[in-house]
Amino acid sequence: MDKRLLTIQDVSCVGQCSLTVALPVISACGIETGILPSSVLSNHTAGFSGWTFHDLTDDMPKILDRWLTEKVTFDAFYTGYVSKAQIPHILDIMEKT
C-alpha cells in the first residue's frame, strides 16, 4: 500500500517557497501528496515591498468534512506556514484522517 502525506502550508503565487517548492520535491520522491493551503499570498514576504494575504482557516473544517465523506486518510503530515488559529483544525485533521 502506498503511503500518503498531507502538507499544510501557504501558497505564495510568486517566489520560490512554500507549497510551490514542497509539492514537487515530495512528489519527486514518489510520495503521494495531498495539500491543504493555509493561506494564499500574492508573493513571498521576503524581498518584496508588500503582499496580499488571504487566510483559509474557515475552509479547513469544510475540507475535512469532504475528506471524511470520501474516506481520505493520510499517513504523515508536513506543515509549513500556518497561523495559531489553524492549529486546532490541523490537530483535528491529523486525528481524523
Region locations from a protein language model:
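Ribokinase/PfkB-type carbohydrate-kinase core domain
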Residues: 2-15, 19-97
